[in-house]
């Protein structure tokens, strides 16, 4: 099939293009359109040799451009990948095999925790940094952090392999030691929940910002991630088949999701409705529910996370119990109350491990989801009065 097109960048008629392929935007250099094919065969391409750091930057740029990474996450990944390069030293990443990957994993167990915050470690890199931290008897990163580091490297090398920069992914399915109990995030106990919801501000009904009142309650009764709640718009509070709930999505400005499975509908627990959540939503003058929370490094949860960390310290909650602990408690409580695991997965935005469930089934009806949500115990919030507008 042949077509003739006219270029917008010159007056010369363009010769027919083979296979009927015409670029969507004709504002190209005429020479491109005069060729027989818009594509360049692989054998005709010249591979530019990039340094390891250039490949890291390209990997991060692609992630940000495709909205897979926020600027904040990209910077965290940059720091980790540069830490890896400081240890590897060689510029040719093709030289890294499985044995070297295993060696790097062992070195990670000796990696100092927050080296930038310890002035005694400033100026040290690579092996010298590890040795200096050992001399000082400094803390090392947790096994959970090691696992995340290895997962990042596996993603990076998978990306390199898909683009022909390396021949193998030496970090693929590389096992790490199981996390120690003190490395894990903990669930919130009944006594923890009682402490949180009997804070003085809940008793006095004196809140500096609306999110001081609503975020702990929403975390408790939705199982959502902190940023998913901080980024909510009024238009995200919807009614489906007579059931009020929260639409967690990334449709509006500044919203982001962890992954595709995160998009979901979470019904409102009766404890939220009875305390005036719908009236609060209606009263918001801002399109966002918590307009007082600014976007910081791609996340609306920045200030709220710091606020809850201060609250945790004031309450004397154990290390490892943070805003994300509500999510762990949500999952465990519904599981203990006999709610089917695939219903729980749908409520929290986790993918199903079952091919049958993930491929052939549709979402649960709202009335089934709200029935599960309302199994959550609300005795801890019994003394909390409705929100005063």
Which positions does each model-derived feature cover?
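Short, polar N-cap/turn motifs at the start of nucleic acid-interacting alpha helices
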Residues: 237-240, 318-319, 339-361, 382-389
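Non-catalytic DNA-binding core/recognition domains of DNA-processing enzymes
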Residues: 68-87, 94-159, 174
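Active-site/catalytic core of tyrosine-dependent DNA strand-transfer enzymes
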Residues: 193, 252, 267-318
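Basic, Lys/Arg- and aromatic-enriched nucleic-acid-binding interface segment
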Residues: 133-151, 166, 173-226, 230, ...
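C-terminal catalytic core of tyrosine-transesterase DNA break-rejoin enzymes
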Residues: 214-217, 221, 325-351
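Conserved tyrosine-mediated DNA breakage-rejoining catalytic core shared by Y-recombinases
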Residues: 231-275
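Catalytic-site neighborhood detector that most strongly recognizes the C-terminal catalytic loop/helix
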Residues: 252, 295-296, 348-381
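N-terminal helical hairpins
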Residues: 1-54, 58-67, 73, 121-123
């Amino acid at each position: 099939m042949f077509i003739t097109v006219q270029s917008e960048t010159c007056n010369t008629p363009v010769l027919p293009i083979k296979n009927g392929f015409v670029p969507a935007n004709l504002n190209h250099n005429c020479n491109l359109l005069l060729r027989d094919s818009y594509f360049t065969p692989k054998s005709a391409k010249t591979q530019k040799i990039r340094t390891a750091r250039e490949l890291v930057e390209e990997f991060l740029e692609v992630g940000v451009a495709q909205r897979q990474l926020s600027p904040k996450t990209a910077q965290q990944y940059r720091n980790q990948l540069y830490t890896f390069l400081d240890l590897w030293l060689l510029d040719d990443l093709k030289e890294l095999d499985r044995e070297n990957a295993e060696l790097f994993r062992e070195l990670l167990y000796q990696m100092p925790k927050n080296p930038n915050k310890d002035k005694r470690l400033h100026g040290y890199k690579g092996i010298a940094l590890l040795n200096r931290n050992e001399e000082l008897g400094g803390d090392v990163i947790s096994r959970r952090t090691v696992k995340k580091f290895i997962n990042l490297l596996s993603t990076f090398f998978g990306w390199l392999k898909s683009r022909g920069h390396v021949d193998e992914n030496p970090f693929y399915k590389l096992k790490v030691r199981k996390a120690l109990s003190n490395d894990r995030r903990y669930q919130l106990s009944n006594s923890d929940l009682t402490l949180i919801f009997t804070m003085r501000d809940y008793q006095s009904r004196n809140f500096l910002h609306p999110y001081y009142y609503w975020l702990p309650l929403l975390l408790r009764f939705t199982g959502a991630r902190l940023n998913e709640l901080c980024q909510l718009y009024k238009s995200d509070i919807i009614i489906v088949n007579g059931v009020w709930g929260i639409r967690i999505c990334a449709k509006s400005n500044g919203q982001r999701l962890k992954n595709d499975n995160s998009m979901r509908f979470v019904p409102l627990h009766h404890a939220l409705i009875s305390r005036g959540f719908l009236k609060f939503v209606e009263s918001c003058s801002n399109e966002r529910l918590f307009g007082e929370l600014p976007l910081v490094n791609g996340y609306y949860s920045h200030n709220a996370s710091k606020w809850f960390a201060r609250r945790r310290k004031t309450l004397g909650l154990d290390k490892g119990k943070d805003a994300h602990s509500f999510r762990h408690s949500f999952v465990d409580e519904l599981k203990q109350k006999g709610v089917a695991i695939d219903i729980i997965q749908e409520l929290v935005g986790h993918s199903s491990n079952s091919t049958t469930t993930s491929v052939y089934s549709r979402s649960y009806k709202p009335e089934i989801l709200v029935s599960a949500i309302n199994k959550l115990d609300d005795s801890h919030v019994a003394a909390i009065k409705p929100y005063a507008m």
